Amino acid sequence: MSAAHNPLRPPMTRPTGRFLLAHPAHAIALGFGSGLSPKAAGTVGTLWAWAAFLALQPWMSEARWGLLLLISLPLGWWACSVTARHLQAADPRCIVWDEVIAFWLVLWLLMPTGWPEQLLAFGLFRYFDAAKPGPVRWADRLYHDMDPSHTRHGWAKAGWGILVDDLVAAFCTLLLMALWRTF
């Protein structure tokens, strides 16, 4: 049994570059390193998502973005589930793939738009993700009141729990952006 799976060993407090490279799921879940930030990993992961979106934009059509998001959701669920299990934590702060998928969704549905709207969307998304008002708090609590450590099925549920609140934060961001655009 490896140290990452040993229930007698305390959970890792903060992953390292070695942990990131130890499994493909870790690299994905940790946002290809952006989740290793010692402070504000969610914000750093969202900034990485924004930069990656802009870098990929010249080669992506609407259909390609849709396909990438459809692939990224189950891939992200798997990566988040595996990484959370290896870290022995239901929703480690270093896992930022949830921010990546959710902010890509926001940008995909907002584009084309200029820097001011992208910046506003970034700020709103970070607010909803960090403060977890109303519906985001509800989504966060759906899965986080459980102890996933006993079963593999529990870790699979933890993976969805990591993703769901960020998707609700993306929806709230898009709703406010739509209201802002109408006025």
Predicted region positions:
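Hydrophobic alpha-helical transmembrane segments
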Residues: 2-89, 93-95, 100-183
